[in-house]
Swiss-Prot record:
Glutamate-gated receptor that probably acts as a non-selective cation channel, at least in roots and hypocotyls. Can be triggered by Ala, Asn, Cys, Glu, Gly, Ser and glutathione (a tripeptide consisting of Glu-Gly-Cys). Mediates leaf-to-leaf wound signaling. May be involved in light-signal transduction and calcium homeostasis via the regulation of calcium influx into cells. Contributes to pathogen-associated molecular patterns (PAMP) elicitor-mediated resistance. L-glutamate binds at R473, D543, V544, A545, R550, F702, E746, R747, P748, Y749. SMART domains: PBPe (SM00079). This is Glutamate receptor 3.3.
């Protein structure tokens, strides 16, 4: 920190400058390079930088007439040594630095670069904290760990794991990388359960590594992300192999430190390769190209078989080329190489032995920085271009799997398409690639040489029991109840489901049930669930409804019972009455139907009147025909034939309408007559809200808060009820006697209540949809495993058998309170019989009136003669009249048709008779005139 404050102090000494300027384009441009010569990355970078300088100097299109001169310094990843070497560079008038390699060095010399305006092009610093706002002259030519940690989080999320353990080197590189991992996991609702930091020099301390791994073994997660340096990483894997942590059940994800070693030392020594079997590794992705393949051929000639090329060697090469192209643009824009000194630094240098007067400021540093950032080129690592935040565009990683004597490519990750088995450069050509149909990763050979995906979590074998909260209910004990005489033993439907699910888990889960409640009234389930967040409970088992406010603080298993709020109210039967046959249609329907019958009859009469004799005749007859035809179509019994085309068309359509009306009427009437109708003044939750009647709810249920907060029902209307007996009494008394109009409760409780109380029923629909589940802390893997077990219970029928054991009641089921079939009684039909009887009596009455009129209107001649011959005895007259009445009733009456025909025939006979009479008279007159004849 003292060195940092020194450089901050120097930044204020910016007066009294004098300048050393090269007025012409220099023949040699000096650049520096700082990295660790002995590291895997440094060994490759040294060769790559030398080759890049050679290519720049031999290319006439870059810096024509100017040569690169590079000076390399070994920082050994030491902050102090890095600062010293950087100070030495500042004495040599360099215009740019390739490096540094390590985060600790980058943090130190970036402050110096800011003050002296010398761009730093780092090919290996992945620390995401290196911000361009804080370090404007720091340019990262590699990929940031921000993207690498995003890729790891995507892998963890893809396989459905929830918790990971992070092993990291305890310096800027490790801490900042793990912080980025934590953020990326948190954005996916995942988390780091345990962070194990190791000192960079811990590789030689076997005991410290062993103690750290033993702590990890006692934890539940089995996903380990290791973000360290090479030697430390291999030491961790060696001890993990010894402890059996490289076998079944574990998942190890290594950052790019391992892929760098795999690429540079291919193949790894057998003893090291054996310790990393099944590990997933990330490697910065570089697209394939002819330029890259040609460089690999050159590399084999340069290094032989002693050192293989890794990704960071490619980044080092591209860093030199980027600086060269930036300088080329700088010169073409008229830039000059010039340096300035501070007069104050000269004074300080003369007064001491620090030689500060030799430190110079690069006057063209800001212009060169802009030219570098504005350069676009295609190098060994693909397209080299920067985003506004100084990150490389199109970041991508290879995901490889160590198996056997080598590695397997199982997929890729990019910030454009996420996980995929398709090359990222192909997906970048699509605006929004659809990855739903393609596999995201290939099959992995996991530790233990298995293709089965590890669960990623085990129940910790540390001898501790899970503290499971159980509600101490005072009602509906079929669901959960404490066994009398015990403290931590419970029974009931919920307990049996939980026990059966736990027995299906592939690992043992020791639990201890802890009662919650005072035993006098049902406890608050929301408060009980909140105790999970405070650590009082490790879980809650019981009839706990899955509702929104609870899911925000805990995780629930798959619902093992359907639940939702319903309204229970008293009901009464509505029997079908004498006028039930009128109920299928309302008044308007009856009126419209009758009018339609008349209208169709009139229309058909109009269409048939001129052509059809059956629709002709006197007005009275035609009116009767219209009425008869209209209403006889109701039964398809009309006798009049239609002869016109239009008449037939209208009749066909009308008969189809009549068919539909008859069918609907018959179906509705059948339902009314054969099904009992149940009635309640409350039709559902909406009608209950509109009334001012009191509403009952179960103590401890979430129904109270739902009614108050969601439905805005006044608290004064809510009546707490504790037992089924209290339910029945409150409903029976009703609002007038201090009871309730209805009760709102969850369906399982209601079904159990109605199984023994048939005077009540559910009215309306279930107005919330939820279920019962077991509650555990957020992101608990146990909730996931138990959900799978509950689904298995449902599939094999065990869940239904447990339900039938505790909740199946035979005394009075809910169906008895629903609509049911019954026999038909006379009271349902006496109205029809009455109408029919009245019609019959009325017809008889009119008929007898007509007979009597005929009896007195047209007496026969024989009857008159007999009346004259007999005495006037009253009894004889009554007998005679009765005989005449009976004789008249028995006499056949001419039909109107026959009467009309008879009249016509009589008229014709009269006409012919008069003609014959007139002829006879003429003949007689003729004979009298001619007597001789």
């Amino acid at each position: 920190m003292k060195q940092l404050w020194t450089f901050f102090f120097l930044s204020f000494l910016c007066s009294g400058l004098f300048r050393r300027t090269h007025s012409e384009k220099p023949k040699v441009v000096k650049i520096g390079s700082i990295f660790s010569f002995d590291s895997v990355i440094g060994k490759v970078a040294k060769i790559a930088i030398d080759e890049a300088v050679k290519d720049v100097n031999s290319n006439p299109d870059i810096l024509s007439g100017t040569k690169f001169s590079v000076s390399m310094q070994n920082s050994n990843c030491s902050g102090f040594m890095g600062m010293v070497e950087a100070l030495r560079f500042m004495e040599k008038d360099i215009v740019g630095i390739i490096g540094p390699q390590c985060s600790v060095v980058a943090h130190m010399i970036s402050h110096m670069a800011n003050e002296l305006r010398v761009p730093l092009l780092s090919f290996a610093v992945t620390d995401p904290v290196m911000s361009p706002l804080q370090f404007p002259y720091f340019i990262r030519t590699t990929q940031s760990d921000l993207y690498q940690m995003d890729a790891i989080a995507s892998i963890v999320d893809f396989y459905g794991w929830k918790e990971v353990i992070a092993v990291f080197v305890d310096d800027d590189f490790g801490r900042n990388g793990v912080a980025a991992l934590n953020d990326k996991l948190a954005s996916r609702r995942l988390r780091i359960t345990y962070k194990a930091g190791l000192h960079p020099d811990t590789a030689v301390n076997k005991n410290e590594i062993m103690n750290m791994l033993i702590k990890i073994m006692l934890l539940q997660p089995r996903i380990v992300v290791i973000h360290v340096y090479s030697e430390l990483g291999f030491a961790v894997f060696k001890e993990a192999k010894y402890l059996g942590m490289m076998g079944n059940g574990y998942v190890w994800i290594a950052t790019d430190w391992l892929s760098t070693n795999l690429d540079s030392s291919s193949p790894l020594p057998a003893e090291r390769l054996e310790t990393i079997q099944g590990v997933l590794v990330l490697r910065p992705h570089t697209p394939d190209s002819d330029f890259k393949r040609e460089f690999f051929k050159r590399w084999r000639k340069m290094s032989g078989a002693s050192l293989a090329l890794n990704t960071y060697g490619l980044y080092a090469y591209d860093s030199v080329m980027l600086l060269a192209r930036g300088l080329d643009k700088f010169f073409k824009d008229g830039g000059n190489i010039s340096f300035s000194n501070h007069s104050m630094l000269n004074t300080l240098g003369k007064s001491g032995n620090l030689n500060l007067e030799a430190m110079t400021v690069f006057d063209g540093g800001e212009a060169l920085l802009k030219d570098i950032l504005g350069t676009r080129m295609v190098g060994l690592t693909g397209q080299l271009q920067f985003t506004p935040d100084r990150s490389r565009t199109r970041p991508a990683y290879d995901i490889i799997n160590v198996a056997g004597t080598g590695v397997r490519q199982i997929g890729y990750w990019s910030n454009h398409s996420g996980l995929s088995t398709v090359l990222p450069e192909l997906l970048y050509t699509k605006e929004k690639p659809n990855m739903s149909t393609s596999p995201k990763l290939k099959h992995v050979i996991w530790p233990g040489e298995t293709f089965t995906k590890p669960r990623g979590w085990v129940f910790s074998n540390n001898g501790k029991e899970l503290k499971i909260g159980v509600p101490l209910r005072v009602s509906y004990k079929e669901f959960v109840s404490q066994i009398r005489g015990t403290e931590n033993m419970f029974k009931g439907f919920c307990i049996d489901v939980f026990t059966a699910a736990v027995n299906l888990l592939p690992y043992a889960v020791p639990v201890k049930f802890i009662p919650y409640g005072n035993g006098k009234e049902n406890p608050s389930y929301t408060h009980m669930v909140e105790m999970i967040t405070t650590g009082n409970f490790d879980g809650v088992v019981g009839d706990v409804a899955i509702v929104t406010n609870r899911t925000k603080i805990v995780d629930f298993t798959q619902p093992y019972a359907a639940s939702g709020l319903v309204v229970v109210a008293p009901f009464k039967k509505l029997n079908s009455g004498a006028w039930a046959f009128l109920r299928p249609f309302n008044r308007l329907m009856w009126a419209v139907t009758g009018c339609c019958f008349l209208f169709v009859g009139i229309v058909v009469w109009i269409l048939e009147h001129r052509t059809n004799d059956e629709f002709r005749g006197p007005p009275k007859r035609q009116c009767v025909t219209i009425l008869w035809f209209s209403f006889s179509t109701m039964f398809f019994a009309h006798r009049e034939n239609t002869v016109s085309t239009l008449g037939r068309l209208v009749l066909i359509i009308w008969l189809f309408v009549v068919l539909i009306i008859n069918s609907s009427y018959t179906a509705s009437l059948t339902s009314i007559l054969t099904v009992q109708q149940l009635s309640s003044p409350i039709k559902g939750i909406e009608s209950l809200r509109e009334r001012d009647d009191p509403i009952g709810y179960q103590v401890g249920s979430f129904a109270e808060s739902y009614l108050r907060n969601e439905l805005n029902i006044s608290e004064s209307r809510l009546v707490p009820l504790g037992t089924p007996e209290a339910y029945a009494k409150a409903l029976k008394d009703g609002p007038s006697k201090g009871g309730v109009a209805a009760i709102v409760d969850e369906r399982p409780y209601v079904e159990l209540f109605l199984s023994s109380n048939c005077a009540y029923r559910i009215v309306g629909q279930e107005f919330t949809k939820s279920g019962w589940g077991f509650a555990f802390p957020r992101d608990s893997p146990l909730a996931i495993d138990l959900s799978t077990a509950i689904l298995e219970l449902a599939e094999n029928g065990d869940l239904q058998r447990i339900h039938d054991k505790w909740l199946m009641k035979n005394a009075c089921t809910l169906e008895n309170a629903e609509l049911e079939s019954d026999r038909l009684h006379l009271k349902s039909f006496w109205g029809l019989f009455l109408i029919c009887g009245v019609a019959c009596l009325l017809a008889l009455f009119l008929y007898f009136v007509q007979i009597i009129r005929q009896l007195y209107k047209k007496p026969t001649d024989d009857a008159i003669a007999r009346d004259q011959q007999q005495n006037h005895d009253s009894s004889s007259m009554r007998s005679t009249r009765l005989q005449r009445f009976l004789s008249l009733m028995d006499e056949k009456e001419e039909s109107k048709h026959e009467s009309k025909k008879r009249k016509i025939d009589g008229s014709m006979n009269d006409t012919s008779g008069s003609t014959r009479s007139r002829g006879f008279d003429r003949e007689r007159s003729f004979n009298s005139v001619n007597p001789l004849d």
